[in-house]
Amino acid sequence: MTIISAEQVGNRLNDWRIAIRKHDVHNAKTIYTELKELLQEMEENQEVLTYYSLLEGKFKLMLYERRGKKLNEPTVLEYPSKTNDLIEYYFYLYKALYASYNRDYASAIGLFKIAEKKLQNIPDEIEVAEFHTKVANLYMMLRQSLISLHYIQNAIDIFKGHDGYERRLAAAFVIAATNFMDIGDFKRAENYYTKALHISNQLNDHFLASQLYHNISILYAEAGESKKCIDALEKALSDDDYLSSCYFEHSMFMLLKELLSIDEKSQALYYFELVKQKQEIDRNPIYTAKMNFLYHLFFTEDISKKAQTCFDDISILKELKDVEGARELSALAAKHFEELGSIHQAYLFLKDAYQLEHTTLNWRNYDEKSEFTHFRFSHRCFRTNGVLQFVK
């Protein structure tokens, strides 16, 4: 058997890295298959294997962002004994991204800060833009909008100056839009979404368009425009690939919530049946609890039973460490019971939402707490942008 040099494999790894950071799914998958064969025939080289392991993590995250592929538990990596600047940077970046994915936000922030120092030794503008995008996404999730906008504007400026990174520019536009939405500037938020949708149309990328329609539906929900929100969600759910991804659950939860908010119960029941059929094949405990909550809140007649079952569903989210989701549903229940005139139950859910907000604050250190945006109830679901998660 012919032994392949580590340099040859390393060169192909660089090709893979470029495909991954461009979010070129087809090419990245092709190179991934090729690399698995090359590694079987490569001479022993720990540095190349470490580089491959770290890029594989980025590859899986890309598939999660672009196609909604589920992430498995990450391989635990020891600190590489022999590294160069790029591998050392990837090491901390990879760990930061997984810490964020697992909702360990305090650790993620610390690891991102270490990675940022390592990044100073890497003269690569696109790598800088990618890093700023990921950090901006984290601060966006933590509602630190001004910090997030600082990072994402840097990324936008870089991506605009390089051809071939239109998808990454669209992802950056989404993060900017979300931050402007969080500070109540709906017009600027909509403008950024319009720019991102224009890119998806130019690329003829229907999956990306579905992700964008989901995210813009959140903007319309925040602005109290339920019909526009529902229209955007139905457009998101019109793509077959999107329907088979994990993002389906995000959009369906949002769609059901908006339909019920305008008392379209018959249409909501139709979608509940679709969700039930899909959950028989692929069950997600977080979204099962969320769907059950919506059904109990709007279809259970007895007030006491309604309140108890909703508290039970929220407790499941707490056990699964979905604090943001639990807070959102507590706020939604408080509003619903207030409208029914059940002030005591409304108070209990309002109190729960307030306590969950302080649980959220505990993710941050003291300095970050002082910068956190003022608490307000926000009936949002999770976004489909993981840059995670964010269009991706």
Residue ranges and their predicted role:
Residues 139-218:
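Solenoidal tandem-repeat scaffolds enriched in leucines and small polar residues
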Residues 19, 39-40, 79-80, 99, ...:
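Eukaryotic all-alpha helical interaction scaffolds
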Residues 178, 191, 195-304:
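Alpha-helical scaffold segments of alpha-solenoid architecture
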Residues 20-36, 61-76, 103-114, 144-154, ...:
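Helix-turn-helix repeat elements of alpha-solenoid scaffolds
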Residues 3-8, 44-49, 83-90, 123-130, ...:
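Alpha-solenoid helical repeat architecture
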